[in-house]
């Protein structure tokens, strides 16, 4: 019989590796969140999770959406359910939006611009999420 904790640790490790290899910086402490979010420019925050729609839709969208003429200056991620304090701190910046994972938040100069929430990810195709993210990049980001 498979050890559930061993299995989940492997799922979490793979989820972390997938988003980091897509160019996102992991924020694992509240201090790291504050440091990252106070930078000038645009920041895309991917709120990672172990659910199926994170692996099948959100992380692929996170990886592919940034291959676009206009994109955020900074790409970061927090892991809901894993790095709880960092995720809680990040959510303090997402004023007006309920906690949701997976999700994406677009910040400009540390202020929330918009979000793609779980209900806009779950049950959708990765290309739909990519198109939504890129429309936000088009409106809010500069060519890099």
Swiss-Prot record:
The coiled-coil segments of this chain are: none
The UniProt entry, under Pfam families, shows: Disulph_isomer
Q: Name the domain of life.
A: Bacteria
Q: What processes does the entry annotate via GO biological process terms?
A: cell redox homeostasis
InterPro entries per record: BrxB/BrxA
Regarding protein family, the annotation reads: Belongs to the bacilliredoxin family.
Q: What is this protein called?
A: Bacilliredoxin BA_4378/GBAA_4378/BAS4061
Q: Which organism is it from?
A: Bacillus anthracis
